[in-house]
A protein has these predicted regions:
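Short beta-rich binding modules
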Residues: 1-200
């Protein structure tokens, strides 16, 4: 893929026109199309790790804030390693300085725009492309990148390959009493006042 850059965006909510959402958009493209990952400004509570229970075993998941930090780290280390070293020493108060953070990060990665790289995408439950889960919690309780999705060291696990093959083999569902003629076709083509520390 080709890295097309990072942009800051804001838009008003549909349900609540008074609500303004601030996002960071990361763009890639190749001959098959465009992929954009949209990350929302961290909000209060995003630094809390969720705990789920399965068969009596509790499992802690990385917080949204940790995922955001490690996303920036992964992009920075893969696309602008020298400039990222300086960037991660900076501190930004969130959510107030989210726009400043995004524009600063866009600036340190601008030399990588139009650079060819590898991007790992998987399918979500709807079959749409998305980034894989890439942050995990160690036994010691530390968050870490467990799944590279950008750069030269991008690989698919056996499980991910099996899921891709499953997606490819999924055909249309047969519906009794219907035929393809029954359907018309178309050919139209972080938390309040929290400081973001980038030591990861």
């Amino acid at each position: 893929v080709i890295f097309k850059g990072i942009t800051f965006n804001e838009f008003k909510g549909k349900k609540d026109p008074d609500a303004v959402y601030k996002t960071m958009r990361i763009s890639f493209e190749n001959e098959n199309g465009v992929y954009e990952e949209t990350v929302f400004c961290p909000k209060e509570g995003d630094d809390v790790r969720q705990v789920s229970s399965n068969n009596g075993v509790e499992r802690e998941s990385p917080s949204n804030f940790e995922k955001f930090k490690f996303m920036l780290a992964h992009i920075g280390e893969q696309l602008a390693p020298k400039k990222y070293e300086a960037f991660k020493t900076k501190t930004f108060a969130l959510p107030e300085e989210f726009e400043k953070l995004v524009k600063t990060f866009a600036d340190i990665t601008k030399d990588a725009v139009n650079k060819h790289t590898n991007l790992k995408l998987i399918a979500n439950k709807k079959g749409e492309p998305c980034l894989p889960y890439f942050v995990n919690i160690s036994k010691a309780g530390d968050a870490y990148i467990s799944n590279n999705w950008l750069g030269d060291k991008v690989f698919f696990s056996d499980y991910e390959i099996s899921q891709m093959n499953k997606q490819k083999s999924n055909g249309p569902t047969d519906m009794p009493g219907t035929s393809s003629d029954d359907f018309a076709t178309s050919n139209d083509a972080a938390t309040d006042n929290a400081d973001l520390d980038f030591e990861v």
